[in-house]
């Protein structure tokens, strides 16, 4: 009986966490460069189930398998699959085709991002929509003279036909293990690239979220139903436990 209560409560907790993650992914469906969060699930409090024909002190015990008391969220990880490309025709919108991340400077140090919504600030420095400076391949802020900016597929930025900088693009052999999410669309990781892929830069495009809206909504409905079922099971177990305690009281 108590085991059933453990299982139901753990299912409620797990589904509450899953609902929070799914809601976060849904809230960022329109965020350029967003990488959805995925989760694994596993059991907890695993034990051995035994079978005996009589007294535990004298009868042989046969192990029949393992028994868990519920489920829990196992591991949370970032899905780095590339999102769809959306054309904007904004000359300072950049998207990366393939692997790689733009390098930006924040108050907490350098960070990596796939969000290519860039702007000129009041000092003609290339910055993100959050005001972080975009860095070149030497780790320096990119200064843009007045004029029309263009970027090549290799990331070379030109203004009025003259080269001014090359985008600092970090490439990683295994971003899932090498990068850690910090906040928003930012990641921290090694100072130098570890991968050999050469991404292509597309000007006038943005990479959109890699989350699938219809899939997320389906999962959200499934989680809500699972939570409701577990909640009803907790209520049933609670009622049954109450009746059992009441019966034992009458026997005494």
PLM features: what roles do these ranges have?
Residues 1-252:
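Amphipathic alpha-helical polymerization modules
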């Amino acid at each position: 009986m108590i085991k059933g209560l453990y299982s139901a409560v753990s299912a409620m907790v797990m589904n509450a966490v899953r609902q929070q993650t799914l809601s976060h992914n849904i809230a960022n469906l329109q965020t350029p460069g967003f990488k959805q969060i995925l989760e694994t699930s596993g059991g907890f409090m695993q034990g051995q189930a035994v079978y005996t024909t009589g007294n535990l002190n004298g009868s042989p015990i046969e192990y029949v398998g393992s028994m868990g008391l519920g489920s829990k969220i196992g591991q949370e990880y970032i899905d780095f699959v590339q999102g769809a490309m959306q054309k904007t025709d904004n000359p300072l919108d950049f998207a990366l085709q393939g692997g790689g991340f733009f390098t930006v400077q924040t108050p907490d140090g350098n960070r990596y991002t796939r969000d290519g919504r860039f702007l000129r600030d009041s000092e003609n420095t290339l910055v993100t929509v959050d005001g972080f400076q975009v860095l070149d391949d030497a780790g320096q802020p990119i200064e843009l003279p007045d004029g029309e900016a263009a970027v090549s597929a290799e990331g070379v930025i030109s203004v009025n036909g003259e080269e001014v900088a090359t985008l600092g693009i970090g490439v990683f052999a295994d971003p899932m293990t090498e990068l850690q999410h910090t906040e928003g669309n930012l990641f921290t990781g090694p100072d130098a690239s570890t991968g050999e892929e050469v991404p292509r830069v597309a000007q006038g495009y943005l990479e959109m979220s890699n989350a699938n809206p219809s899939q997320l909504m389906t999962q959200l409905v499934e989680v809500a139903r699972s939570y409701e079922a577990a909640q009803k099971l907790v209520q049933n177990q609670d009622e049954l436990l109450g009746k059992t305690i009441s019966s034992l009281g009458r026997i005494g």
